[in-house]
């Protein structure tokens, strides 16, 4: 009989091989994703996912392995593959090209999500947040102290703070496009309309998902048309990927 240390060594070797196989699977998944993008196919293929799960479940039963555990494992692998493919699609189809974005509230959970999302698309992202400890060339404690030379300004702060920011913008003006992500629109609808009436490019969106979302397939984003500049259409282009459903109101 083998001693426990020998058995543990064999287990460790198997663990490393499993990780190597996961890496190989990720590489193959990236290649599949590239073909999907080239042929204009959506990231997610539910029929293929079902086939993968059923094959894994069947093989698990043949080996006497708990099928539910194997299904959980395969779902994790599928999610990881989809995330890899989505990230590649966002980067490839992104429209940033070095344009500048200011995310007000960029240390918050949704603010950080948008900062990363837009950075992936090639935007130069700056962050303004009152919770910053110190400032540098791309991080600011007070958004009002930033230069007004951003192509896009994102307001990703709590509602009360968003109202204060929008009131200040109404007073001082803001170049470039502007949008907020508040989930409740009624308290800010009037001030957004006033901002639009002053000729600024403004829209309002509501992501129908939370900051923990790293897989956009099947998710929805609501867009409000607030001005005559087609700002909502321009901002929609930032999210115009095959995995997202865009709702225009």
Where do the language-model regions lie?
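Hydrophobic/small residue at the entry helix of a nucleotide-binding pocket
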Residues: 110
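N-terminal Rossmann NAD(P)H-binding glycine-rich loop of SDR-like oxidoreductase domains
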Residues: 107, 115
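Rossmann-fold dinucleotide-binding core
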Residues: 188, 192-245
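Extended, charge-rich alpha-helical interface modules
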Residues: 1-95
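Conserved small/polar residues in nucleotide/adenosyl-binding loops
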Residues: 247-249
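Rossmann-fold NAD(P) dinucleotide-binding segment
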Residues: 156-191
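NAD(P)-binding Rossmann-fold cofactor-contacting core
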Residues: 120-137
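Short acidic low-complexity segments
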Residues: 136-150
């Amino acid at each position: 009989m083998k001693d426990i240390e020998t058995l543990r060594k064999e287990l460790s070797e198997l663990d490393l091989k499993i990780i190597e196989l996961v890496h190989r699977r990720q590489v193959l998944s990236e290649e599949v994703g590239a073909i999907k993008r080239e042929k204009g196919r959506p990231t997610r293929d539910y029929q293929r996912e079902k086939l993968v799960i059923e094959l894994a479940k069947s093989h698990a039963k043949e080996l006497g392995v708990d099928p539910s555990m194997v299904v959980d494992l395969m779902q994790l692998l599928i999610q990881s593959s989809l995330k890899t493919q989505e990230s590649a699609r966002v980067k490839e189809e992104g429209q940033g090209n070095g344009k500048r974005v200011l995310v007000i509230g960029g240390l918050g959970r949704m603010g950080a999500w948008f900062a990363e999302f837009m950075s992936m698309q090639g935007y130069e992202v700056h962050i303004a947040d009152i919770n910053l400890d110190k400032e540098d060339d791309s991080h600011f404690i007070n958004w009002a102290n930033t230069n007004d030379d951003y192509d896009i300004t994102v307001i990703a702060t709590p509602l009360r703070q968003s109202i204060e920011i929008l009131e200040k913008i109404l007073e001082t003006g803001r170049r470039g496009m502007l949008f907020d992500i508040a989930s409740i629109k009624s308290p800010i609808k009037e001030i957004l309309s006033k901002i639009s009436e002053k000729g600024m490019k403004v829209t309002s969106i509501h992501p129908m998902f939370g900051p923990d979302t790293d897989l956009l397939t099947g998710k929805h984003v609501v867009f409000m048309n607030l001005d005559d500049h087609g700002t909502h259409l321009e901002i929609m282009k930032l999210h115009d990927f095959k995995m997202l459903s865009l709702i225009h109101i």
